[in-house]
UniProtKB/Swiss-Prot annotation:
Residues of the signal peptide: none
Role of this protein: One of the primary rRNA binding proteins, it binds directly to 16S rRNA central domain where it helps coordinate assembly of the platform of the 30S subunit.
GO cellular component annotations of the record: ribonucleoprotein complex; ribosome
Family recorded in the similarity comment: Belongs to the universal ribosomal protein uS8 family.
Species for this entry: Wolbachia pipientis subsp. Culex pipiens (strain wPip)
Lineage of the organism: Bacteria, Pseudomonadati, Pseudomonadota, Alphaproteobacteria, Rickettsiales
Biological processes annotated in GO: translation
Xref: PANTHER family: 40S RIBOSOMAL PROTEIN S15A
Description of how the protein assembles with itself and partners: Part of the 30S ribosomal subunit. Contacts proteins S5 and S12.
Keywords: Ribonucleoprotein, Ribosomal protein, RNA-binding, rRNA-binding
NCBIfam families given in the database record: PRK00136.1 (NF001109)
Gene3D superfamilies from the UniProt entry: 3.30.1370.30, 3.30.1490.10
Protein name per UniProt: Small ribosomal subunit protein uS8
Molecular function in Gene Ontology: rRNA binding; structural constituent of ribosome
Length: 131
């Protein structure tokens, strides 16, 4: 099985699992997916994640977070797509949903939130937005 957009598949699995009210979901392992999950955990959007290996295929098990029986993640969407990449300079990075959400950006200094990218004055590829 080949994926043309691994990050898009990763985000869709999380979105679908949240809408179906699952406690956890399994996504394919990659360094970028792991970095995004680290940010989501730090920002309080998920409970936890861990790497597991079944049949020599590494994957990440994500424990989803809910508040009053509704998903904490209201919207998670891909911004930069394989067919249309979206790059932003540090001064052009806006706040997601007027500061209520986050953009996750891949920079030369690693994957980080929009707030950290503005603070460190680095730009990069805007991977996704989370609200």
């Amino acid at each position: 099985m080949s994926l043309s957009d691994g990050i898009g598949d990763f985000l869709t699995r999380i979105r679908n699992a949240q809408l179906a009210m699952h406690r956890e979901t399994r996504v394919l392992f990659s360094k970028v997916n792991s970095s995004i999950l680290k940010i989501l955990k730090e920002e309080g959007y998920i409970l936890n994640y861990e790497k597991q290996e079944s049949d020599s295929i590494p994957s990440l098990v994500v424990q989803l977070k809910y508040y009053d029986k509704s998903p904490v993640i209201n919207d998670i969407a891909r911004v930069s797509k394989p067919g249309c990449r979206y790059y932003s300079k540090c001064k052009d990075i806006s706040k997601a949903y007027n500061g209520l959400g986050i953009f996750i950006i891949s920079t030369p200094k690693g994957v980080m939130t929009d707030y950290n990218a503005r603070r460190l004055k680095v730009g990069g590829e805007v991977l996704c937005r989370v609200f």
